[in-house]
Amino acid sequence: MSRIRSRNTGPEMTVRRELYHRGFRYRLNRKDLPGTPDIVLNKYHTVIFVNGCFWHGHEGCTKYVRPSSNVSFWEAKVKANRSRDAKVTAHLEALGWYVITVWECELSPSRFLSTMDEVEASLRANRFRFLSDKASEKRRREAGSILRKRKRADVLSKEKSSLSGHRIPKTVRSLSDSSEE
C-alpha cells in the first residue's frame, strides 16, 4: 500500500487531460476544502473526485473484488473510506459546492467519452445553477437592504413625531435632517 499514490494517479491524469482539452481550467488538491478534492473548478463552483473502484468500494463494479486474505481489515478499510467520502460530499454540498464523482471503471476506453460528456454537461449545468443562485442571493440581499432602509425611515419618523413636542435647537434639527439624505 505504500506505493499507492493519492495524487496524480492514472485515472486522475486522464480526466484532467480531457477537461483541459475541452477548455476547462481547474485547480488541484485545494487543501482549504474538505477532503482535498482532486480537481476544483472555481468558475463552476464544482469539485471532482476521481475514485479508484477498489479503494473506495464501488458496488457492482468488476474492479472491486474483496481480497480473500485479511477480510476483516479490508472490509473495515473500505467501509471507512465510503463513510469518509459520504461525509466529505455532504460537507462540500453544505458549503455550496457541487460534487461530481468519477469512478475508475467509467474511464475504460468504451465508456470514456460518454463519461466525459456527462461530466461536461454537469459542469455547464452547475455553472448555470451557481450563477442563478448567486443572482437570487443578490436579489435577496437587495430586498433585505430595502426593508432595513424602510424600517429605519419608520423609526426616524416616529422619533421625529415623538420629539416634536420638545424644543430642539435648529442646528441639531438641521444636522438630523441632513443625515437622513
What are these regions (language model features)?
Residues M1-T101, C105-E181:
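Nucleic-acid endo/exonuclease domains
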